[in-house]
Amino acid sequence: MIGKLKGVVDTLEEDHVILDVHGVGYLVHCSGRTLSALPRAGEAAALFIETHVREDQIRLFGFSSAAERDWFRLLQGIQGIGTKTALAVLSTLSASELTQAIALGDKTTVARAPGVGPRVATRIITELKDKMPGFSASEPLAAQLGGGGVASAQGGAAADAVSALVNLGYGVPQANAAIAAALRGAGEGAKTEVLIRLGLKELAK
């Protein structure tokens, strides 16, 4: 199984790239967002890979980040969503934007993707709100948060929730304040997903 490819961009097309890896050209299907982030032909590039094997073909799907690949996998687990729709969602929304939209229950944002109407958007939010990837704190981030605030005071779910907000681009003080407010509303036993959702609502005020 191929997990990642690193090579030189040979050809860029509307829905795929051909990546030259030591003389072998791999045709890799990508979201529009990933394709637009790739360098021009002749320059080095790397992609996280998801491999689909069928009786009559092998297809490679490439992503600029592991988070985007994880979302691709999750989206396909929903009834009625195939590779085309999953890539359309990821062409419209970045991994962090999709995470935020699902956490807030924002079906209007999710429905912006081609082929995703309100009904499918609602299904995406309902089925994935408790499966959102990328919420575990890394050691550097945990150390950064450890200096004070709600993350160090509460630990566990609160620390993971603060980490998730920081990963979405919010500052540490903002994230701490938002999760502190979430804890006041939900109580200390609240799960990480609940704290993230409430924290994002605080930040959206």
UniProtKB/Swiss-Prot annotation:
Q: Give me the ranges of the annotated region Domain II.
A: 65-143
* GO terms under cellular component: cytoplasm; Holliday junction helicase complex; Holliday junction resolvase complex
Q: Name one GO biological process term.
A: DNA recombination
The UniProt annotation puts the region (Flexible linker) at: 144-152
Q: What is its main location?
A: cytoplasm
The highest taxon in the source lineage is Bacteria
Compartments in which it is found: Cytoplasm
Q: Where is this region: Domain I?
A: 1-64
**What keywords would UniProt list here?**
Cytoplasm, DNA damage, DNA recombination, DNA repair, DNA-binding
Keyword match DNA repair: yes
User: What's a single GO MF annotation on this record?
Assistant: ATP binding
Query: Where do the record's region annotations for Domain III lie?
Result: 153-205
Q: Give the record's family classification.
A: Belongs to the RuvA family.
**Role noted for this protein:** The RuvA-RuvB-RuvC complex processes Holliday junction (HJ) DNA during genetic recombination and DNA repair, while the RuvA-RuvB complex plays an important role in the rescue of blocked DNA replication forks via replication fork reversal (RFR). RuvA specifically binds to HJ cruciform DNA, conferring on it an open structure. The RuvB hexamer acts as an ATP-dependent pump, pulling dsDNA into and through the RuvAB complex. HJ branch migration allows RuvC to scan DNA until it finds its consensus sequence, where it cleaves and resolves the cruciform DNA.
Q: How does it assemble?
A: Homotetramer. Forms an RuvA(8)-RuvB(12)-Holliday junction (HJ) complex. HJ DNA is sandwiched between 2 RuvA tetramers; dsDNA enters through RuvA and exits via RuvB. An RuvB hexamer assembles on each DNA strand where it exits the tetramer. Each RuvB hexamer is contacted by two RuvA subunits (via domain III) on 2 adjacent RuvB subunits; this complex drives branch migration. In the full resolvosome a probable DNA-RuvA(4)-RuvB(12)-RuvC(2) complex forms which resolves the HJ.
Record text about domains: Has three domains with a flexible linker between the domains II and III and assumes an 'L' shape. Domain III is highly mobile and contacts RuvB.
Can you say what this protein is called? Holliday junction branch migration complex subunit RuvA
Record organism: Xanthobacter autotrophicus (strain ATCC BAA-1158 / Py2)
